[in-house]
UniProtKB/Swiss-Prot annotation:
Keyword match Transcription: no
The protein's name: Primase D5
The species this protein was found in: Fowlpox virus (strain NVSL)
Gene Ontology BP annotations: DNA replication
Family: Belongs to the poxviridae D5 family.
Catalytic residue positions: D174
UniProt keyword terms in alphabetical order: ATP-binding, DNA replication, DNA-binding, Helicase, Hydrolase, Nucleotide-binding
Amino acid sequence: MALSVIRNNHIIFVLKQIGVRTKHRENNNSKYVESFTCDELERYIYSNPDCTLFETLKDEEYYSNVRVFFDVDMDGRLDDKYQATHNFVNIITKFVADYAYNDCKMISNHRDKDKMITDMKSNFSITESTDKEKTSFHLIFFNCYTTLDTLINMRKKLIVLTKESNNRLVKAIDTSVYRHKPSLRIVGTKKDSINIHVHKKTKQNIHFKNYLFTYVDYNEEDCYYFVSEQQHQSPDLLNWKEEYIPFHDAIKKISKAIGNSIINLKDITAENFTVTPLDIYYATPCNLCKKVSHKHPHHLLISNDCIRIYKSGNPNSCKIKTISLEGNKLFSISQQIIDLNVINVSDRGEYLVWLKNVWRMCEDDNNITKLILYMRDHLSSDCTDLLLCPRNRKVIEHNLKDMLIDTIETDTYPEKLQFLNGVYDIKDSIFYQGNDAKKFVCTVSTGYKYEEGINVDDITTELMSILDDIQPKTKENFENRELYEQILSSCLMGTTKQCIFFFYGETATGKSTTKKLLKSVMHNMFLETGQVILTEQMDKGPNPFIANMHLKRVVFCSELPDFSCNTSKKIRSDNIKKLTEPCVVGRSCYSNKINNRNHATIIIDTNYKPVFDKVDNAIMRRIALVNFKTHFTNTKKKVHNSKYDFIKPLNESLDSKIQSNYFRYAFLKILLGWFSKYHVPNLRILPTPDKIPDFKFRLKVESLIIPSNSTHVKYVDKLMKLGYITDDDGIPVLQLNIFQQKLSLHFNVKLYGQDIDSFIMKNKKYMNLADEYMSFIFIEDLNTINEPRNT
């Protein structure tokens, strides 16, 4: 434990290989460790040019003062090494000075931060790796001292600096070296026996000792020394914190650890325990090291929320015992995580975590566990070891769930498209990253990273040519092409669509190619489902097809059956209506979540014209159809088919390009352009009932007749001459058989006889038990009786 008064250290403790075990360090096994003065160490390296040596602290509990140091490791070389290093030193010296004066206690008498920066720039050593394939060096400020715990605390802010800085060397700083038992390769030595590269001096006039971070030669006039606030107060000035276990419980743990009787135990209080030596009566050997007794007494001190029992005199002659004072450290960790606003619960009871700068949904508990491990860089250093234990992580996980009370609304940003590295605003063309994206809580992501500024102009031109073949930009196909662009670009928007869309055409007309391109762009937001969502009844029972639609932005249903077959089920009109509602009811197996938010553009890929079990105005307002009339083939035979407008050669390499996501960013760029063209400021897609054969009867009927009402009473006398009768209210109506005869004059009975009968069955009314009538008036009859008035 470092004290407020710094003591010099001229003995360098070295490891002779990486990963020396603790027992070899403690036993001073000369095969693995050795101690040198600076001159001895320099001579040893000169005599053993192939040696591997790493300097480290021998006993951090006893002594942990070090020089401020940085380790940089980057692949590749710098074009302007001098200027890059100069900029790096400027950034780092300011960072160290800011941290020392703003977050720490400056023990030395210096109060001028600018002078400290200037002095650091004049008093540093820097090594250089002989490896020409990488940029690697150690930077040591030999006039700037601190403690290891202070460097560990500094690591959090250094991580932030490395993430936010644009300097390549700053980004390449290895922050993992700031830990307990750190080691740094000594200048002039190899990493291992296989590696031929070493770190060499860059300035021969700088003494060898100034290339060592554990060498301490402190001078109050010329050197700087700072420690963290908590460490500066420890041990004598640190008060007993409220969150610690009760003091008498701590004394009980101390007594148990000592084993022997503590004669002055009653004299020890929370105010004096750090300055009162323990008077131990050794009835049995020491419980810590098993020696018969000790000449010097044991003492207590506080460090990192722990009581440490150490022996005065030679502290290495007895083991140091550590007793935690935290009442519930795991709960404290949970509270720190909650305060960072990185975990929430949705109104569906699903947990969301902010992990690697994106919101992720926890379908199981794996993401919460990953979050806990990921937070180790954002928690205090004494918490990180606790996170390594799986049992501790499970406790923290349950704590987090129990501490979340209020649910939050999610996915309320229809114009936001989430990627793995941020959120893209498709309306304003802005890409949000990091904390800027955090406010947009989107639980479903495309599953890949957005590449900003990527040049895809050539690929876009190639892809646009393919799309122009699938849906030609001709005068005859203008409306079809426009609807095609509107539908595809609507997939980007996370809101309920007013229509279901049919892609209708023969085989090899580009429907599947369109689907694959959409899947490449939308990826995890794309769902391919079966025809059951259209033909089977939708209820609250298990329906994984519907449950998987939750928050998806594209749902593709391929290959509807041939409706001309008697065994084929027709499309249920009720299902169409439900699929255009904001909430679709259906649950996964073994799940109670039945309400699924419907943000999808639902596209039906079919070779057969759709047929519905019933047709009304509501269903006609919900259907749009795109015809695909370009046939792609490489056959040498001529293709004669009235259903094709164009015959184009088949590109056999197209599938492999799409599957490799070759067109991903190009198609995304095209979709964004179409979105701005059609859907800003509002989403706009109109139905096309006139393209659906099943709707033609209904559309024609509506152009022939109108429902009769009280406004037609004044025409009763004239209408009765045309075969009309009156109902109980005096409103003109037609007898059922006369209505059927008049309607049949406008239709081919062989084609539409069943539709006529179905319409009559649905709308007929009864005057009495025997007489049936239809409460409609033919528009042509109204025109006939009004003609004389107009003349």
